[in-house]
Amino acid sequence: MAPPNKLPTRKLAKNGPEISAVGFGMMGLSIAYGVAGSDEERFRVLDRAWELGCTNWDTSDFYGDCEDLIGKWFKLHPERRDDIFLASKFAIKVAVKKDGSYDFSVDSSPESCRAACELALQRMNVDSIDLYYIHRIDKVTPIEKTMEELSKLKIEGKIKYIGISECSSSALRRAYAVHPVAAVQVEYNPWDIDIENESGTDLLATARELGVTVFAYSPLGRGIMTGKYKSKDDFEPADTRRFYPRYNDENFPKNLKLVERFQEMAARKGCTSGQLALAWILAQGDDIIPIPGTKKIKYLEENVAAVNVTLTKEEEQDIRKMVNEAGIAGDRFERLGPYSDSAPL
């Protein structure tokens, strides 16, 4: 049975399927943004996403128990597997140090790729993963070697499309020369437009040249564009945003100025500032798909409804001017390296 609601769709890459124009980033269901809910609470969020037609789901083996959660949900609703376009990722490793802090590393080797994919299939209770990303590129494995292994997994029917997260234009070109890449995933929001510029290796232009779809993670600036947060004290104690430079006591008040301008325009349009931010990302091209995340149904519904917010040419230009003039303070804190290059072959 298909979902009761159908969202507008966007085509994946040159020859891929049509998938919902707004996706669902699932990291927050399990890690990073405070305490995760019970399985039952999170199942209700997944149920609602399906009901709304938001069936383009993005997870990772790095996201705590999220792959397991999806597997449990599919066991409850096996008839819904074909409705979901399911993306996952591999390569980020986490270890807990003696002092309780976390140590992050990256392993995008062929061996890591295959082992992670096999485990993800088991955890998610699926026969194939629709889109499988290299979550980050390590500093020792030539990306050609990883792509060769991903190509084998595709031939074996274990994955259908290949993606890369936070890669440089050079790495994307090298990967694409081995096998077509369907998607790249980077942070893209009114706070961060590096993908458009030399600071982001002009990745957007490269992706468009090659026919690669861009999935925009954190399209709401990790929730800040909603206007819900005014200081880092508004975050839960276990929320990782407390440690990000953009949200410290010095930078946060400066960065909220852009949010306030979005709120003013959104009020005039009769939508929320978060919906306006998503509408702006959607307006940047049919090859861009935002994947906002949330662990609450009301925000999921709000995000999905952004597909109904249309911008006039003048409004899009006004927003572009606001974004260009914003002068965001502080790094986005991509500890594993944004727009990463690959080791030489």
In which residue ranges do the predicted regions lie?
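Active-site mouth loops of central-metabolism enzymes
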Residues: G28-E40, D99-R114
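N-terminal binding-site loop/beta-alpha segment at the start of enzyme catalytic domains
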Residues: M1-F85, L345
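Beta/alpha (TIM)-barrel catalytic core signal, keyed to glycine-rich beta->alpha loops juxtaposed to Asp/Glu
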Residues: A2, K6, I137-M322, A326, ...
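Active-site groove signature of glycoside hydrolases
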Residues: L121-V140
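Structural preference for beta-strand elements that scaffold enzyme active sites
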Residues: I19-G23, T55-N56, F62, D83-A87, ...
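A short, structured active-site edge motif that brings together acidic residues
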Residues: D82-A95, P190
